[in-house]
Amino acid sequence: MTNSSAKRIVISGAGGMVGTVLAGQARAQGRDVAAFTSAQWDITDAAAAEHLIRPGDVVINCAAYTDVDGAESDEDRAHLVNAVGPGHLARACARVGADLVHISTDYVFSGDRREPFEIDDDTTPMNVYGRTKLEGEHAATSAY
């Protein structure tokens, strides 16, 4: 049974660990879920977001280039997926009146602390992966 009064949940990167769990949990709660793997929805394609996102949707961006070591040698691809793609999603969401939840990483911080980081701590990524994910955060927030 679907909860018709709730907003549709749109998940990018639904083939990954976080996206798979989120889609399963949302469906188990009876939510209207549109879950897309990276093969089904390339978030680096700005036009694709315009066709998939509807007014009132809640878009959860789980899509990412997650190969931390690989990002060092494939910086262009990491930047495209982790920084440019979230910007496309955010602008499309802002245009149609959808909400965006962007999943990031603790790699945006330096990693040299023993206690948990707080949301307002300084960001000091130490590698390409962390830097591109931080760029994605900035791209997503600047659209709103």
Located regions from the model:
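N-terminal Rossmann NAD(P)H-binding glycine-rich loop of SDR-like oxidoreductase domains
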Residues: 7-28
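Rossmann-fold NAD(P)-dependent oxidoreductase module
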Residues: 21, 25, 92, 139
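Catalytic helix-loop patch of NAD(P)-dependent Rossmann-fold dehydrogenases
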Residues: 73, 80, 85-88, 108-144
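Helix C-cap/helix->beta junction micro-motif
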Residues: 29, 95-97, 143
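SDR active-site strand-loop-helix element
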Residues: 12, 36, 62-63, 100-105, ...
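Adenosine-cofactor binding site in Rossmann-like domains, unifying the SAM/SAH pocket
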Residues: 27-49
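NAD(P)H-binding glycine-rich loop region in Rossmannoid oxidoreductase-like domains
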Residues: 43-81, 92-96
